[in-house]
Design a protein with these regions (language model features):
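Acidic anion/phosphate-binding donor-loop and adjacent secondary structure
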Residues: 31-34, 40, 50-66, 87
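Nucleotide-activated donor-binding/catalytic signature segment of Leloir-type glycosyltransferases, i.e.
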Residues: 73, 100-109, 114-141
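Nucleotide-sugar-dependent
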Residues: 86, 134-143, 150-171, 176-192
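Short acidic alpha-helix that forms the nucleotide-activated donor recognition element
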Residues: 14-17, 96, 115-116, 136-147, ...
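Carbohydrate-associated surface elements
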Residues: 28, 46-49
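Conserved donor-binding/catalytic core segment of Leloir-type glycosyltransferases
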Residues: 68-86, 92-95, 106
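Conserved donor-binding loops in enzymes that form glycosidic bonds
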Residues: 21, 48, 78-83, 110, ...
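Membrane-proximal helix-turn-helix segments that form the acceptor-binding/catalytic region
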Residues: 3-22
């Protein structure tokens, strides 16, 4: 461990132990950091939640057909941060292998890995991969409804490091979801709700 890591660990413990209370979003994060507390009673779980007034299957409005054209293709969608927490190589490989099928892939968002996706799209001629800017929040239920399946390819190093909060909005909109992350089921939702099989 480097001197920098040692110092940061000490700062982390100091913050935890000087605080009146600390919250985390699930059991995974709780179990990861609880041993760093002198008083574990300071650590509390407040789960992620969904605004069901916005995210529900009936809240659908027309989309810009220049961005989201009406076609009979199977549409797979990811919306959110395009970062290192996700593994984008399986997506690129999948788009390449299915380029002759009636399947389109939509990635909506920004992040440090967006340039990688755009580079792969250009180099490999992946015309059915659409990399789009963030869309207005009020349109997200409609965008989820536009697609047939949502997907999340988690990076292997993120195994069991919490649960993607976007899963809850997808579930609230009653859309199917494909999550890929090594050999393990994602997070603690399968254990709590009997899903993820």
């Amino acid at each position: 461990r480097s001197l920098q890591q040692t110092c940061l660990k000490k700062v982390e413990r100091c913050i935890y132990n000087k605080s009146a209370a600390i919250t985390t979003i699930d059991d995974v994060f709780y179990n990861t950091i609880v041993s760093r507390f002198e008083d574990p009673n300071k650590l509390h779980i407040i789960p992620n939640f969904v605004d069901t007034d916005l995210y529900n299957p009936t809240n659908v409005e027309p989309l810009d057909e220049n961005i989201f054209p009406k076609t009979d293709s199977l549409k797979l969608l990811y919306a959110g941060n395009i970062g290192h927490a996700q593994d984008w190589r399986p997506l690129v490989a999948l788009v390449e292998k299915t380029k002759d099928l009636n399947v389109e892939y939509f990635v909506v968002g920004m992040g440090v890995q967006r340039s990688y996706l755009e580079q792969q799209k250009a180099e490999k001629g992946l015309d059915k991969l659409h990399v789009l800017d963030y869309q207005p929040r009020h349109l997200m239920p409609s965008i989820l409804a536009y697609s047939d399946v949502q997907f999340i390819f988690m990076a292997p190093e993120m195994e069991m490091m919490g649960f993607p909060s976007k899963v809850y909005t997808i579930m609230a909109c009653e859309r199917p979801l494909l999550i890929c992350s090594g050999d393990k089921r994602r997070g603690n939702l399968p254990d709590c709700y009997g899903t993820g099989r």
